Amino acid sequence: MEMDMDTIRKAIAATIFALVMAWAWRVLDWAWFTPKRIEKRLRQQGFRGNPYRFLVGDVKESGKMHQEALSKPMEFNNDIVPRLMPHINHTINTYGRNSFTWMGRIPRIHVMEPELIKEVLTHSSKYQKNFDVHNPLVKFLLTGVGSFEGAKWSKHRRIISPAFTLEKLKSMLPAFAICYHDMLTKWEKIAEKQGSHEVDIFPTFDVLTSDVISKVAFGSTYEEGGKIFRLLKELMDLTIDCMRDVYIPGWSYLPTKRNKRMKEINKEITDMLRFIINKRMKALKAGEPGEDDLLGVLLESNIQEIQKQGNKKDGGMSINDVIEECKLFYFAGQETTGVLLTWTTILLSKHPEWQERAREEVLQAFGKNKPEFERLNHLKYVSMILYEVLRLYPPVIDLTKIVHKDTKLGSYTIPAGTQVMLPTVMLHREKSIWGEDAMEFNPMRFVDGVANATKNNVTYLPFSWGPRVCLGQNFALLQAKLGLAMILQRFKFDVAPSYVHAPFTILTVQPQFGSHVIYKKLES
């Protein structure tokens, strides 16, 4: 009997040892051998970069360069790549365009050839979003249709698209105008008393565009939607911290201060949105007419999709899906337009001749009357200016995808698990595409449209390109056109003496040390 027990104990110990060794081998393969195998394959195809460092990759080096780049402002010019992406810039300068960096254990190649960029953005099923390599808590913010793939993405995009038709955008214009009118009236009163009015425009436009999205998405004012906005801002800061860390699987489940706070914020936002949505759904089921805002259009479109699919349970979006899309409306809807208006104002302050051209065009079209939808879309100079601002200061500085299986890209075979980065902010400065003045603010390059400016290359990506082009790009551009037109009707503006040029990126490209601009009321 003792012999039997001893044999059993040995068998159990051997089994445990084998399991531990198997687990250790899998971890070692995940953390070392797989990255090294991918590195070897990339080098064999002519890609160059730093050798892989266990788990951390280039994160320490990148973090140090990033910290150094942001430690001081720069001269006012548009050569912002060394400040926004110093490590990528250094890597490409050192190893060439066919290079790679390490995001922890994940290799990331840089793609800068127009035909390869087109291939990546055309085949979105092969080149997918890379949120899975980050802490899962990142998805509390980076959610909705922009984060989905495959059938779920197709379904969500189909349901959401009706909210962004030209007809719907036209119906939103009065709500846009009310928000801008209220802000500009306050500015006018201050300017009349003081002769001018100094404004830190980025936080001001941030609040303004949040007010706009609250009205057009939920039919509520900024005061009512303000809590959601403030919570999303806090969640955004915490999300950035997560994305900068090397993610270790399981880390998101630990009760760290950051993890706990992110979960608390997400629950609070979700509960508030659920209350709004359930109230709307109850009214629709009672036969009441739907409201003509983004949420109303989304809910009606969702009901139609469910009916079209034979009232199947998974035929449309669930309440949780709708909540995630509302978060995306709030975050993307206000953030993109806020930064676009900020950089447009700063660049027009530095280029007063273009400010005057745009003002003359606006006054000729509308005088001092409220801008109308049809003529707003035919403001040529204003459109050219916005396109040029989006070229020099795109909302996001890169588009990064990941391949989940070996994938042919041109003459290369990209190994499974590799990220593919399209460095937007660099592509927008390529002299071979944009000419010798690529670093200069020159809206005339868009006089014959984007296709002519890019020589029909896929190298202008402020809102991405292809099947996954941003659904809200016309929403952002219309709001920016209206805002700029209404400001030009009432004010001249110049950057304040205190302004220092320091673009940096927190998901979007923002001014690091403030964005003070002086507004002077136009003579009647």
UniProtKB/Swiss-Prot annotation:
GO terms for cellular component: endoplasmic reticulum membrane. Pathway: Alkaloid biosynthesis; secologanin biosynthesis. Residues 33-524 are cytoplasmic. The chain crosses the membrane at residues 12-32. Residues 1-11 are lumenal. One of its GO terms (biological process) is alkaloid metabolic process. SUPFAM superfamilies: Cytochrome P450. One of its GO terms (molecular function) is heme binding. It holds the Pfam family p450. Its cofactor is heme. Upper and lower leaf epidermis. The keyword tRNA-binding does not apply. It is a single-pass membrane protein. The keyword Endoplasmic reticulum applies. InterPro entries: Cyt_P450, Cyt_P450_CS, Cyt_P450_E_grp-I, Cyt_P450_sf, Cytochrome_P450_Monooxygen. It is found in: Endoplasmic reticulum membrane. It is an enzyme of class 1 (oxidoreductase). Belongs to the cytochrome P450 family. This is Secologanin synthase 1. It comes from Catharanthus roseus (Madagascar periwinkle). The gene is SLS1.
